[in-house]
């Protein structure tokens, strides 16, 4: 299988290195990643600016851009052969609930899904800077080898792995997205006249405890796998909204 590997933590991160180290033993791996940290960039693309792309060798490229840029170049820049799977991660920190809308890790995988590729985003609860993510990468290898034939193109598969996990398929749970809320705060520094630098901070207010969610699985020590649809239409109100507007217009 030809696997494009990217992330939002940057080319130097241990998570992406672990995936390549493990997967290249059995698959053709093509690594293309941002030059630096690009967390919380979702599916941002460099539309109006050029990007500097550095070729290390035929299988390794560095992009001064966003994670979705990396996927786009990898798929359409004529640098790699035809890609079968877009793999984003391993992210340092989880992406669950509302996080998926902001995450550059999930955004990169979503861009692959839009272009009709198998797409998997992988995040870990282990945020230690010196952690190597080899155990997580081994689990990803097992998952890909056993289940890639059952996955659908056009779907983003979002996997979150607890820091203390059992590496077996019996420990995997298929889940739905939960909900997480944050209290956002900003601090101001370097204030000169009416100009200041704003820094985002804050804390988590809470997350869902509903059974069947990614949060419930993760915090019970299970690996969560959530299929994310590209179609974000809210079908629960579609007919009601259409009928309501039709009555008002007529």
From Swiss-Prot:
Cofactor binding notes: Binds 1 divalent metal cation per subunit.
Annotated localization: Cytoplasm
Superkingdom, natural source: Bacteria
InterPro entries: SurE (IPR030048), SurE-like_Pase/nucleotidase (IPR002828), SurE-like_sf (IPR036523)
Residues holding a divalent metal cation: 8-9, 39, 91
Alphabetized Pfam families for the sequence: SurE
Name of the protein described by the UniProt record: 5'-nucleotidase SurE
Organism of derivation: Leptospira interrogans serogroup Icterohaemorrhagiae serovar Lai (strain 56601)
Gene name in the database record: surE
């Amino acid at each position: 299988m030809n696997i494009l590997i990217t992330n939002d933590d940057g080319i130097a991160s241990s998570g992406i290195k672990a995936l390549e180290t493990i997967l290249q033993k059995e698959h053709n791996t093509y690594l293309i990643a941002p030059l630096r940290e690009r967390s919380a960039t979702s599916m941002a693309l460099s539309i109006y600016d050029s990007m500097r792309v550095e070729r290390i060798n035929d299988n390794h490229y560095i992009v001064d851009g966003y994670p979705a840029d990396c996927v786009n170049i990898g798929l359409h820049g004529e640098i790699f052969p035809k890609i079968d799977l877009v793999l984003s991660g391993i992210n340092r920190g989880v992406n669950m609930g509302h996080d998926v809308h902001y995450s550059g890790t999930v955004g990169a995988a979503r861009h692959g899904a839009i272009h009709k590729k198998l797409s998997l985003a992988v995040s870990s609860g282990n945020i230690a800077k010196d952690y190597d993510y080899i155990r997580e990468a081994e689990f990803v290898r097992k998952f890909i080898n056993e289940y890639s034939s059952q996955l659908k193109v056009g779907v983003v598969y979002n996997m979150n792995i607890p820091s203390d996990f059992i590496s077996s398929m019996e420990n995997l749970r298929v889940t739905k997205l939960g909900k997480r809320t944050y209290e956002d705060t900003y601090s101001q520094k370097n204030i000169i006249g009416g100009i200041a630098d704003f820094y985002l901070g804050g804390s988590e207010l809470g997350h869902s405890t509903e059974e069947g969610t990614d949060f419930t699985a993760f915090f019970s020590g299970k690996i969560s796998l959530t299929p994310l649809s590209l179609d974000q239409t809210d079908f629960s109100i579609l007919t009601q909204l259409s009928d309501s507007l039709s009555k008002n217009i007529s």
